[in-house]
Amino acid sequence: MANPLYQKHIISINDLSRDELNLVLATAAKLKANPQPELLKHKVIASCFFEASTRTRLSFETSMHRLGASVVGFSDSANTSLGKKGETLADTISVISTYVDAIVMRHPQEGAARLATEFSGNVPVLNAGDGSNQHPTQTLLDLFTIQETQGRLDNLHIAMVGDLKYGRTVHSLTQALAKFDGNRFYFIAPDALAMPQYILDMLDEKGIAWSLHSSIEEVMAEVDILYMTRVQKERLDPSEYANVKAQFVLRASDLHNAKTNMKVLHPLPRVDEIATDVDKTPHAWYFQQAGNGIFARQALLALVLNRDLVL
């Protein structure tokens, strides 16, 4: 039977049902346990990064290579026809889609990835981040990591800390975890960077418990996952950035009453929000989390590009 993600655009985490999320995670686990270096041997994938990226771009391109795909693309739109000659995004995508089997795209403008789907024909577009909107593949690796460390994706207590306004990772992750049962959220952020109201309204509509807090200490003993984020300098004016960047910092001493299996996650890069002394604790799991990006992205590529995937 054809898998439901074959040739599907993946723009928002809301494009995936709970069953489809579980399919991606199960596929990721299989690929982690049993690599498939020729699964995409005859596929060509475009890696189109209109915005700076290190982890996401390298993770995606490594995933492509490890599945045997050929990779074309760019990491700096300033050197493309779009950047130098004023070509529209629509024309850029229309042309690239004639060359490749799938397009992985990051863009600073919210909605750009969805717009790209209107011009890619039958070529699926995978959103690698569009402005402060969505980052669905980061969410998949987050879910994979949570499932690996906690053994489940339901009945969890999850705290999210820092920039919850502009941090697209926390928007996507909250929406994804809301598809599972019994989860409870704690949001810890300065007023200027609070979780958007539409996310809180979504949780209310689903009857999911959440609360706002002013310090990590208030919730440390309760949580299974502590999801830290950096204050995004590139999305704030200098005076606002200076006021909030040091407001929430996690140190090893803050973990004294944490649950034994509580894990600290972070989408990276970090700045000062996690002290380096946390790295040596058993709670630190952000580097393993980043490594899981390979398997989550391999799984998504494999499913989107294979009608009948059997592993």
From Swiss-Prot:
Q: What reactions does this protein catalyze? A: carbamoyl phosphate + L-aspartate = N-carbamoyl-L-aspartate + phosphate + H(+)
Keywords from the UniProt entry: Pyrimidine biosynthesis, Transferase
Q: Which Gene Ontology BP annotations are present?
A: 'de novo' pyrimidine nucleobase biosynthetic process; 'de novo' UMP biosynthetic process; amino acid metabolic process
Q: Among the entry's GO cellular component annotations, what is one?
A: cytosol
Enzyme kind, highest EC tier: transferase
Q: What does this protein do?
A: Catalyzes the condensation of carbamoyl phosphate and aspartate to form carbamoyl aspartate and inorganic phosphate, the committed step in the de novo pyrimidine nucleotide biosynthesis pathway.
* Family statement drawn from the similarity comment of this UniProt entry: Belongs to the aspartate/ornithine carbamoyltransferase superfamily. ATCase family.
Q: What is this protein called?
A: Aspartate carbamoyltransferase catalytic subunit
